[in-house]
């Protein structure tokens, strides 16, 4: 992927780098929990009647984790219902591109499924979800199509899908990761329409 060549400061994505990033995100999440839970526990120990305040404190920590997962969910925008001729044409061409096996999933969820060496990708208009082998961890990537916002929605997905097929590791290198964590955390934040896609991969 040519975009990866102009970003030499980014280490090329690989199985090893994705595993490392996953561990970093897990440590960060654990750090958030500890940061908010320890003072809450200390507060209860000092003054048991302060339990409601401690609960609010822990709630703030949980909210931070939800906000991070929500950010990942917002970065992957599914295709909406086609309203114009060009939109319907683009969706038809995208359906041919993904093949019969995943066309039904595309129509149902608005995301295109692409299986690769790094895992299963669910591609939307402005990014993609990578479900790692085993299905327990996901990485959310945000990436914009350079040609602009006047393209039909399905064309934007097609551009990202073709880039992913051309160079999977390059795609993961260029795209901006905005969440990594357990699949169930992301499933709580995505639109109901998208959830079947996460269940199927």
Regions found by a protein language model. Name each.
Residues 1-74:
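N-terminal alpha-helical membrane-insertion module
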């Amino acid at each position: 992927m040519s975009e990866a060549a102009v970003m030499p400061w980014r280490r090329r994505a690989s199985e090893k780098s994705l595993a490392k990033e996953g561990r970093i995100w897990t440590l960060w999440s654990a750090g958030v929990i500890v940061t908010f839970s320890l003072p809450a526990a200390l507060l209860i120990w000092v003054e048991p009647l302060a339990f409601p305040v401690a609960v609010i404190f822990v709630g703030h920590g949980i909210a931070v984790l939800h906000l991070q997962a929500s950010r990942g969910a917002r970065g992957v925008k599914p295709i909406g219902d086609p309203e114009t001729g060009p939109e319907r044409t683009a969706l038809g061409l995208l359906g041919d591109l993904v093949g019969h096996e995943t066309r039904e999933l595309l129509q149902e969820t608005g995301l295109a499924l692409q299986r690769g060496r790094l895992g299963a990708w669910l591609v939307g208009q402005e990014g993609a979800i990578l479900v790692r082998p085993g299905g327990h961890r996901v990485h959310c990537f945000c990436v914009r199509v350079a040609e602009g916002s006047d393209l039909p929605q399905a064309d934007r997905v097609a551009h990202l899908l073709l880039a992913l097929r051309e160079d999977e590791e390059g795609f993961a290198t260029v795209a901006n990761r905005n969440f990594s964590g357990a699949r169930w955390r992301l499933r709580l934040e995505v639109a109901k329409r998208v959830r079947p896609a996460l269940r199927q991969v």
